[in-house]
Amino acid sequence: MVFGAMKGGEFIVEPLTLPAHSDTLDLCLDTMVTGFRTIIEKLGEKPVAISFAFPGPADYPNGIIGGYLPNFPSFRDGVALGPFLSRTFSVPVFINNDGDLFAYGEALGGILPETNAKLEAAGSSKRYHNLIGYTFGTGFGVGIVVNGQLNRGDNSCVETFCLPHKDNRDMIVEDGIAIKAIKRIYGELSGDSDHKFEPKDIFDIAEGRIPGDAEAAKKTFAEIGAAAGDAMATAATLTDGLIVIGGGVTASHKYFMPALLAALRGKIHTFKGEETGRIQSKVYNLDEPEEFEAFAKGDQQKLKVYGYDEEVIYDPQKRIGIAISKLGASKAISVGAYTFALGQLDRM
C-alpha cells in the first residue's frame, strides 16, 4: 500500500510504501492507520479528506469493501472501511475503484484537456467531453467519465473485464489481456510453458535484448492487443469519446497497438451482408503526429445558413481518438482521487 498527500494537484510529501497484510484484517487496518497517520504527521496540518483507490467489488459510495477479492481475502465478508477511517481521523473518506480514478484523473488533468488544448491550437472547433480509461496490468480495469462526471453506476460495478473474449466466448476477456495472459500466451506460442519470464522480460525478448523467442513475444502482444481492441470497441460504441490506456504493460504498445487499432477499426455486417464499422466513428491514434493532424482537421467546412448572408462551421466527420497515458497510471489515479475528493467536498 502506498500513502501520500497532494495539494494543488501535486505530491507534497514523499510517498510511503507499507506491506498490505491483506490476509489478516486487524493487521491490514492497523497498517492503513499507521500509513495515513505517518503522512498526516509530516504535513503539519490536518487534511481536508482522505481519498484513495481500493479494489472491488465494493459499495464505493458508502465505503464498504466486500465480496470476492483475491488480493484482500480478509475483506470478503464485508468491511466498512470508509466509516472506520472517517471515524479514526475525523475527516471525510472517499474510496473508488482504481480504474475509475485513472479515468477521472485523465479526464480532468490528463489526456482529455491535453487533447482539447491541442485541437484549439490547431484551429479545430472540435472538443471532447467523454473518456474511457483502461489499465493493462494484473487485470483489465476500466473507468468511464461522461461530461466531467465519473460514471460509478448504481452498483459500483461499471466493468468490461467480464466481456467475452473474441476467440473464446465462454472466457472473460481479462484472461486474454492481463499479465497472467501474457505469460501464458508466450508459453503457448514459444513451446516453453515452463518459462519464468514476466511481461517486461517478454517485451525485452521481442526487442532482442535478452534470449528467447522474439517472434512468439511479438505475437503475444499482438494477441492481447486484438482481444483488448475487441472489448474496447463495445465500450467505445456506447460512450463515443476518447480512449486512454495506462498500466505497466503499455511499455509494449509498439507491439500491441497495431492489432488493437485493427480491432477498433474492424468491420461488421448486417444480416443482408451490408458492411459497417464496428465503431461508427473513425478511430485515430493520437500518439502518431500525422494521425493527430488528420484528427484535428476532420472534415471541417463552411455551411451557408439558408435565407441569410451568414455561414457556420460544420464538421460531419464522426471521430474518436486513442492514446497511451502521459501521466502514467499511478499519477493519474492520484490526480483522480484528489480531484474527486475536492468535488465531493464542494457538494457537502
Each PLM stretch: what is its role?
Residues 96-109, 255, 262-348:
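Glycine-rich phosphate-binding/hydrolytic loop that grips phosphoryl groups
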Residues 1-34, 38-41, 45, 65-68, ...:
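Short glycine-rich, Thr/Ser-proximal phosphate-binding strand/loop in the N-terminal lobe
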Residues 47-51, 131-135, 244:
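Short glycine-aspartate micro-motif
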Residues 21-33, 46-49, 58-128, 254-271:
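Glycine-rich phosphate-binding loop and adjoining helix at the ATP-binding site
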Residues 1-6, 133-135, 140-145:
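Short beta-strand scaffold segments in enzyme catalytic cores
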Residues 95-99, 111, 151-201, 342-347:
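Glycine-rich phosphate-binding loop plus the immediately following alpha-helix
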Residues 16-48, 183-254, 280-281, 325-326, ...:
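Adenine-nucleotide phosphate-binding core of ATP-dependent small-molecule kinases
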Residues 120-128, 133-136, 314-315:
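Solvent-exposed alpha-helices and their adjacent loops that cap or buttress functional pockets
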